[in-house]
Amino acid sequence: MRIFALVLLIVFGWLQHTLWLGKNGISDYYGVNNEIQVQQQVNEKLHLRNAEMFAEIDDLRQGLDAIEERARHELGMVKEGETFFRIIGEESH
């Protein structure tokens, strides 16, 4: 009976070691779970960026206001008949 109890104790110890420290054990589970959470955060940021880009694309397709705004700010263009004024602040000496 003692030998049987000893064998059971050894098997139980081996199973516990495998569960906690072995391949696909608890430690691997927590590591993969952390990686999943990090990747979900990255995916959420990319999803928001994509949504902004799609909104900008839709705006460019549907309206001339966005195109006009980009031409004014990025290219420095003005409409025909408009006068461009640049206001420069005073420099402190």
From Swiss-Prot:
Source organism: Vibrio atlanticus (strain LGP32) (Vibrio splendidus (strain Mel32))
Gene behind this protein: ftsB
Pfam families per record: DivIC (PF04977)
GO terms under cellular component: cell division site; cell septum; plasma membrane
Physiological role: Essential cell division protein. May link together the upstream cell division proteins, which are predominantly cytoplasmic, with the downstream cell division proteins, which are predominantly periplasmic.
Membrane-crossing residue ranges in chain numbering: 4-21
Protein's UniProt keywords contain Metal-binding: no
InterPro entries given in the database record: Cell_div_FtsB, FtsL/DivIC
Quaternary organization: Part of a complex composed of FtsB, FtsL and FtsQ.
Official protein name in the record: Cell division protein FtsB
Predominant localisation class: membrane
Keyword Cell division among record annotations: yes
Keywords: Cell cycle, Cell division, Cell inner membrane, Cell membrane, Coiled coil, Membrane, Transmembrane, Transmembrane helix
Entry's localization field: Cell inner membrane
Topology of the protein relative to the lipid bilayer: Single-pass type II membrane protein
Similarity comment text for this entry: Belongs to the FtsB family.
Membrane side Cytoplasmic: residue ranges: 1-3
Stretches of the chain forming a coiled coil according to its record: 33-75
Annotated NCBIfam families: PRK00888.1
Residue intervals annotated with topology Periplasmic: 22-93
GO BP terms in the entry: FtsZ-dependent cytokinesis
